[in-house]
């Protein structure tokens, strides 16, 4: 994999706690990404940071490194109780909270700091058992955090570090009141280290930073470039009748190693899953209706390569670290132009190249002008031959069938149907 996304700045160049540096290097992290190189000098000096960087540029490791260093370098608040964590990391989704926790585990093992995880959906008693033994760093979603706080299972009066990840998504999902509720139960902003990281820093996010942080420094990486230069973008104009057949034909032509297909509704995602599973693809479905344990299992299978294709709503578009995604298909153009950037940001990460293919159908083509205005360029248009689209397609599976979330392993080679233009 290309290392061109890294800077010459090494973690060992900073005055980081030796245990943190050792843990990073053990995991193969030696050089900083641009956002890490900008953030660490500030957080090591005790400055608050509001950071913007494109997805996949290392935001998570930037705030984890800062958090572990700060806790190791500063004593806990006097008379701290067992139910009082020292650091709180808030994430908008369960999947992102789980991912952050997984990324933090090597640092926790190396430093002896204890991690806790709190998210809704399931695992209430299991999560609570960990919290009752005492944790240093608590990672979670706002709803479950508030639930535990109201029952006094956790107390935020000894918080020394706060991280808000994907703050713009917090607004999108309506969590801003929850965030403010949690902040009101912490020590004042000038008595803690505050970090906010997001792929976009809108006016409302900056307002939140002004309100809840202590004179935060704003840092940005590639702020003018909305879409990664390593991502090849492509646009088709199918009719509604030809849209599904075009998608399946493109998949057969591209034969992606690992692809994510985004649609705007759970019903549309289920429909796409049914067609692809029936056609023999190893495909998983990720929507809000999928049970939490199954969602985590599907993400794990996709990451391991047991699934080739993931069909998802935008719940999977923000913050998740899924390596080596080669293709992103926008089956529906998103209603929010920022979601276009976050979707295609699933590919072309960490120095790799990627391919984004969007279908501007009759229903969602009206979203295209706003998207192109936002990203600052027109998406190159490709044509296709309607007569060359796949026709010998099996009847789609229904979601209630036992093979939900997984199809048989693909065999053979792609069918020889080439597009025109």
From Swiss-Prot:
<feature type="region of interest" description="Disordered">
    <location>
        <begin position="392"/>
        <end position="421"/>
    </location>
</feature>
<dbReference type="GO" id="GO:0006401">
    <property type="term" value="P:RNA catabolic process"/>
</dbReference>
<dbReference type="InterPro" id="IPR023554">
    <property type="entry name" value="RNA_helicase_ATP-dep_RhlB"/>
</dbReference>
<feature type="short sequence motif" description="Q motif">
    <location>
        <begin position="9"/>
        <end position="37"/>
    </location>
</feature>
<keyword id="KW-0347">Helicase</keyword>
<dbReference type="InterPro" id="IPR014001">
    <property type="entry name" value="Helicase_ATP-bd"/>
</dbReference>
<dbReference type="InterPro" id="IPR027417">
    <property type="entry name" value="P-loop_NTPase"/>
</dbReference>
<feature type="compositionally biased region" description="Low complexity">
    <location>
        <begin position="402"/>
        <end position="414"/>
    </location>
</feature>
<feature type="binding site">
    <location>
        <begin position="53"/>
        <end position="60"/>
    </location>
    <ligand>
        <name>ATP</name>
    </ligand>
</feature>
<feature type="domain" description="Helicase ATP-binding">
    <location>
        <begin position="40"/>
        <end position="219"/>
    </location>
</feature>
<keyword id="KW-0694">RNA-binding</keyword>
<dbReference type="GO" id="GO:0005829">
    <property type="term" value="C:cytosol"/>
</dbReference>
<keyword id="KW-0378">Hydrolase</keyword>
<comment type="subunit">
    <text>Component of the RNA degradosome, which is a multiprotein complex involved in RNA processing and mRNA degradation.</text>
</comment>
<dbReference type="Pfam" id="PF00270">
    <property type="entry name" value="DEAD"/>
</dbReference>
<comment type="similarity">
    <text>Belongs to the DEAD box helicase family. RhlB subfamily.</text>
</comment>
<comment type="function">
    <text>DEAD-box RNA helicase involved in RNA degradation. Has RNA-dependent ATPase activity and unwinds double-stranded RNA.</text>
</comment>
<feature type="domain" description="Helicase C-terminal">
    <location>
        <begin position="245"/>
        <end position="390"/>
    </location>
</feature>
<dbReference type="GO" id="GO:0005524">
    <property type="term" value="F:ATP binding"/>
</dbReference>
<keyword id="KW-0547">Nucleotide-binding</keyword>
<dbReference type="GO" id="GO:0003723">
    <property type="term" value="F:RNA binding"/>
</dbReference>
<dbReference type="InterPro" id="IPR000629">
    <property type="entry name" value="RNA-helicase_DEAD-box_CS"/>
</dbReference>
<dbReference type="InterPro" id="IPR014014">
    <property type="entry name" value="RNA_helicase_DEAD_Q_motif"/>
</dbReference>
<feature type="short sequence motif" description="DEAD box">
    <location>
        <begin position="165"/>
        <end position="168"/>
    </location>
</feature>
<dbReference type="InterPro" id="IPR050079">
    <property type="entry name" value="DEAD_box_RNA_helicase"/>
</dbReference>
<keyword id="KW-0067">ATP-binding</keyword>
<dbReference type="Pfam" id="PF00271">
    <property type="entry name" value="Helicase_C"/>
</dbReference>
<dbReference type="InterPro" id="IPR011545">
    <property type="entry name" value="DEAD/DEAH_box_helicase_dom"/>
</dbReference>
<dbReference type="GO" id="GO:0016887">
    <property type="term" value="F:ATP hydrolysis activity"/>
</dbReference>
<dbReference type="InterPro" id="IPR001650">
    <property type="entry name" value="Helicase_C-like"/>
</dbReference>
<keyword id="KW-0963">Cytoplasm</keyword>
<protein>
    <recommendedName>
        <fullName>ATP-dependent RNA helicase RhlB</fullName>
        <ecNumber>3.6.4.13</ecNumber>
    </recommendedName>
</protein>
<dbReference type="GO" id="GO:0003724">
    <property type="term" value="F:RNA helicase activity"/>
</dbReference>
């Amino acid at each position: 994999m290309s290392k061109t996304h890294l800077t010459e700045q090494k973690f060992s160049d900073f005055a980081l706690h030796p245990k943190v540096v050792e843990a990073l290097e053990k995991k193969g992290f030696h050089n900083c990404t641009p956002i890490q190189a900008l953030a660490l000098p500030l957080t090591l000096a005790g400055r608050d940071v509001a950071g913007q960087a494109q997805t996949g540029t290392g935001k998570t490791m930037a705030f984890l490194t800062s958090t572990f260093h700060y806790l190791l370098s500063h004593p806990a608040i006097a008379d701290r109780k067992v139910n009082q964590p020292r650091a709180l990391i808030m994430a908008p989704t369960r999947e992102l909270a789980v991912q952050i926790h997984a990324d933090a585990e090597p640092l926790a093992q190396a430093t002896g700091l204890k991690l806790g995880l709190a998210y809704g959906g399931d695992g209430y008693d299991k999560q609570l058992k960990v919290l009752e033994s005492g944790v240093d760093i608590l990672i979670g979603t706002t709803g479950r955090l508030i639930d535990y706080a109201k029952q006094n299972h956790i107390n935020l009066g000894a918080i020394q570090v706060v991280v808000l990840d994907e703050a713009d998504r917090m607004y999108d999902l309506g969590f801003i009141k929850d965030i403010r509720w949690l902040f009101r139960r912490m020590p004042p902003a000038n008595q803690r280290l505050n970090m906010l990281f997001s792929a976009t820093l809108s006016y409302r996010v900056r307002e939140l930073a002004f309100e809840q942080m202590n004179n935060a420094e704003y840092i940005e990486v590639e702020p003018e470039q909305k879409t990664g230069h390593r991502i090849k973008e492509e646009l088709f104009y199918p009719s509604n009748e030809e849209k599904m057949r075009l998608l399946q034909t493109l998949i057969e032509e591209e034969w992606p190693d690992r692809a994510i297909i985004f649609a705007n509704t759970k019903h549309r995602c289920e429909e796409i899953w049914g067609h692809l599973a029936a056609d023999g693809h190893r495909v998983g479905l990720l929507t809000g209706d999928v049970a939490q344990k199954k969602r985590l299992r599907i993400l794990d299978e996709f990451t391991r390569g047991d699934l080739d294709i993931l069909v998802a709503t935008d719940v999977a578009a923000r913050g998740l670290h899924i390596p080596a995604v080669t293709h992103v298909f926008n089956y529906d153009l998103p209603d929010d132009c920022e979601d276009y950037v976050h979707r295609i940001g699933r590919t072309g990460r960490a120095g790799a190249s990627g391919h984004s293919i969007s279908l501007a159908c009759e229903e969602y083509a009206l979203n295209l002008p706003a998207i192109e205005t936002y990203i600052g360029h027109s998406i190159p248009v490709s044509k296709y031959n309607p007569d060359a689209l796949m026709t010998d397609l099996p009847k789609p599976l229904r979601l209630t069938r036992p093979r939900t979330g997984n199809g048989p392993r693909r065999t053979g080679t792609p069918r020889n149907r080439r597009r025109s233009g």
